[in-house]
Design a protein with these regions (language model features):
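Active-site and donor-binding regions of nucleotide-sugar-utilizing enzymes
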Residues: 5-8, 13-31, 55-56, 68-167
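Conserved nucleotide-sugar phosphate-binding/catalytic loop shared by glycosyltransferases and other
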Residues: 33-79
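Donor-nucleotide binding loops and adjacent catalytic segments primarily
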Residues: 36, 54, 191-291
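A nucleotide-sugar donor-handling region in carbohydrate enzymes
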Residues: 47-51, 70, 148-222, 334
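Leloir-type glycosyltransferase catalytic cores
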Residues: 57, 158, 332-380
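Glycine-rich phosphate-binding loop signature in dinucleotide/nucleotide-binding domains
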Residues: 90-97, 201-202, 291, 377
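A donor-sugar binding/catalytic signature common to diverse glycosyltransferases
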Residues: 101-102, 113, 124, 152, ...
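Catalytic binding pocket for nucleotide-activated donors in carbohydrate/polymer assembly enzymes
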Residues: 308-343, 347-349
């Protein structure tokens, strides 16, 4: 038997760890006489809206966290330090054989550092992704975590090459596919059937917007440039904007509130305009994304999900650590340039957008491959 600590800190982490936990449960059920995996789910609480987290745990059929830190907000250094201190204590207490971290958030970095100093093996899910932009905090997190990890599970062959160029030995790199797509493919039909109230929206008759990165929402000049593009686009179609609490705060602070229409029911989205709503659960968001004409985002995971769904995506960033979504998928980088955002949006609205294909091994079986490798490496 192997004892594993699974770390999550933000909502995107939940979609990545859920398939791995589900697979561990399947393995244990199939080997009832000899339990293979003992795991604990550690939630650092890096995303501090408990209601938002609860929605995702429920939709993804995940058990509640075994350990919750409640770290909440703070600077990058404050969050990282607090998590390291708490996670080190958990490692001393639980004595895990392996720690699984996912993605590139501060929780990923903090738990990796604490784990490595105790000489406990680390498995990094989504290893090798690079934007080559060190002004992004996530890039620093990715690079350090990969250096410290014993098992690097990658989503694409580009990531393998990035790791090799950085001197990571080949025997630590494993191309397994994309776990967030495991969740998407598993729950897509369930989301469609459960979220019937959203079906009053006409399919492909609206744009879905997400915007949360500090480089976009904390900079008034950049936010205004994006905002002015949204106003132009919203003159011809509905833009649905499930806004993170922090983004809503910056909208008010910058005085951008007036053109946003706060809507309590999705039945009113037939109207043109920018419709600001509270954050959604996983099923609701997945349904909206799947049926959108276009998605505007600065998220990383959404670039991947839209590629698999075949939904055009415009990424409001100057670079991406997921270039495969551009080379093979439906994604286009538009940055924060107003004219480019408007031009590419109208191209898609006029049915002239790019089409893509599903990348290699994005087939819903990444978590199976990950656990097969762990079983082999630990001689289980």
């Amino acid at each position: 038997m192997i004892k594993i600590l699974c770390v999550v800190g933000t909502r995107p982490n939940f979609m990545k760890i859920a398939p791995i936990i589900n697979q561990m449960e399947k393995y244990n059920s199939a080997h009832s006489l000899k339990k293979i995996f003992e795991y604990l789910l550690v939630h650092t609480g890096q995303h501090y809206d408990d209601n938002m987290s609860d929605y995702f745990f429920k939709d993804l059929q995940m058990p509640p966290p075994d350990i919750y830190f409640g770290i909440s907000s703070g600077t990058h250094s404050e969050q990282t330090a607090k998590i390291m201190i708490k996670f080190e204590k958990i490692c001393f207490q639980e004595k895990p054989d392996l720690v699984i971290v996912v993605g590139d958030v501060n929780s990923t970095l903090a738990c990796s550092i604490a784990t490595a100093k105790l000489l406990i093996p680390i498995a990094h899910v989504e290893a090798g992704l690079r934007s080559f932009d060190k002004t992004m905090p996530e890039e620093i997190n990715r690079m350090i975590t990969d250096t410290l990890s014993e098992y690097l599970f990658t989503t694409c062959r580009d990531a393998n090459e990035n790791l090799k160029k950085e001197g990571i030995p080949k025997n630590r790199i494993f191309f397994v596919g994309n776990v967030i797509i495991d969740s998407l493919l598993k729950y897509k039909e369930l989301a469609d059937s459960k979220v019937k109230n959203l079906n009053k929206l006409k399919n492909k008759d609206y744009i879905l917007l997400t915007l949360h990165r500090p480089c976009n929402v904390d900079n008034k000049k950049i936010f205004r440039e994006i905002f002015e593009a949204l106003i132009e686009i919203s003159k011809v179609t509905s833009i649905i904007f499930p806004a993170h609490p922090r983004t809503q705060k910056m909208i008010k602070e910058f005085g951008f509130s007036c053109p946003f229409q706060k809507i309590l029911t999705l039945n009113l989205f037939q109207m043109k305009g920018i419709h600001l709503i509270s954050p959604l659960g996983y099923f609701e968001f997945l349904n909206l994304m799947d049926n959108a004409k276009l998605v505007l985002t600065d998220s990383g995971g959404i670039q991947e999900e839209t590629t698999v769904l075949g939904v055009p995506c415009l990424t409001l960033r100057e670079n991406t650590e997921r270039p495969i979504t551009i080379k093979e998928g439906t994604n286009i980088l538009v940055g924060s340039n107003k004219d480019k955002i408007i031009k590419e949006s109208f191209t898609i609205l006029n049915d002239r957008g790019k089409t893509g294909k599903i990348p290699e091994l994005w087939d819903g079986k990444a978590s199976q491959r990950i656990l097969s490798i762990i079983i082999s490496k630990f001689n289980l």
